[in-house]
Amino acid sequence: MSRRCDLTGKAVQTGNLVSHSNHKTRTRFLPNLCNVTLISDVLQRKVRFRVAVAALRSVEHRGGLDAFLAKADDAELSLGARAIKREILKKQAAAS
């Protein structure tokens, strides 16, 4: 399982830990990922994702999973999130 957010694409970054004596040690900065179950209002079901906490806050800010996925760029979404986005858009198009 990759250390990548399903919704925003946030992934592991690398860099240096720099001491007071300017000694550099390579390190990995991991995203704060958590497994969450989000509810889609359009699909009327629960969807499980592995997302960064910052992405979870963004989902709430935009008004829920459906609004977040509608506005999100496909390039940064995981394959599962893209499939859910297509389902949501298809169901919204059929409803209108």
Swiss-Prot record:
One of its GO terms (biological process) is translation. Pfam families: Ribosomal_L28 (PF00830). GO terms for molecular function: structural constituent of ribosome. Keywords: Ribonucleoprotein, Ribosomal protein. It comes from the Bacteria. One of its GO terms (cellular component) is cytosolic large ribosomal subunit. NCBIfam families: L28. Belongs to the bacterial ribosomal protein bL28 family. HAMAP family: Ribosomal_bL28. This is Large ribosomal subunit protein bL28. The gene is rpmB.
